Structure formats: structure tokens, C-alpha cells
Amino acid sequence: GRITDGYEELKKLQENPPENCKFLGIVPREEMVDLYNMADVLFVPSYNELFPMTILEAVNLHVPLVLRDLDLYKDILFDRYMHANDNDGFKNCLLKLKNDSDVYAKYQNESRLLSEFYSKEHVLNMWREFYLSAYKDKQEELLNKKK
């Protein structure tokens, strides 16, 4: 199926990766910030994701994102990332980031904005507003029933 398509080809690449590609396996959490600080871009070509922590971790360090064009990302990342659906598209995104410092700076800033949106303080405020609004609506509903 779609998830396992190309598995054998990817397995061969993993066993004999290009010089600039390292498969690290499971990385302890305390080492993740160092890895993200070394990264120029977070590239996630997955066909299927939930809300991935890797993206939140990368945007906290203002790393530009190159992702597959999934509907989920549109809803949670607000087009603040580069996206494509095939190898040529991904290559073009990565080359733009590599060769155009203005494009790179733009997507660093987009990651910064995502980091602010998903900060603990902002998420807490969104939940607070949600619950206060729900409480207010329920109070109004109860008052209207009494009339």
C-alpha cells in the first residue's frame, strides 16, 4: 500500500546512505536541541502524520520546514512552511532555501511565528478563552431557559 511503497528502495538507501545523510536511530531527548541547532532545515516527506512533535521542536529553534503537502498541515501550520508532493518539488524547495538567503530568512521567520503561536503561554490563553466562552454561552443558555 501507500505507506509501504518504496520500502525496499529506502532500506537499501539506509544501508548505504549518501555521504551527507546520517541515520541516527533513537536519539535521547536531551540531545535533540543540539541536533536541531545543527540543522539547516527540517524535511518531513511523510504521507501520513498526526501532530508531529518534531515540527514543534524544529520551529522552536526557527528551523525552516519542508513538508509534504498534507491537509493536516494546512490546518495547523497555516502555510508557514514550504511544501511539495514529489521528489522534484522537494528538491526545488530545498534548493530555494539553500540558494536564496531571503527565502531562507522568510521561512526561519515563519518557523518563529509558529513557535510563538504554539508557545505554552499562547496555547494556555487559547484554552482559557475557549473555556470562558463555553462557560458564558452555557450561562446565557440557562438564563434564557429561566425566562
What is each of the regions a protein language model found here?
Residues L42-F43:
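A short hydrophobic beta-strand element within the catalytic core of glycosyltransferases
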Residues K120-K147:
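C-terminal alpha-helical cap of glycosyltransferases
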Residues D34-A39:
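Short alpha-helical donor nucleotide-sugar binding micro-motif in glycosyltransferases
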Residues F78-D88, K96-S101:
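Conserved acidic donor-binding segment of nucleotide-sugar-dependent glycosyltransferases
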Residues Y47:
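Aromatic "clamp/platform" in nucleotide-sugar-dependent glycosyltransferases that forms part
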Residues L10-V27:
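Nucleotide-activated donor-binding/catalytic signature segment of Leloir-type glycosyltransferases, i.e.
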Residues K96-L113, K136-L142:
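Conserved donor-nucleotide binding/catalytic region of nucleotide-linked donor-dependent transferases
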Residues P64-L67:
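Short hydrophobic beta-strand element within catalytic cores of glycosyltransferases
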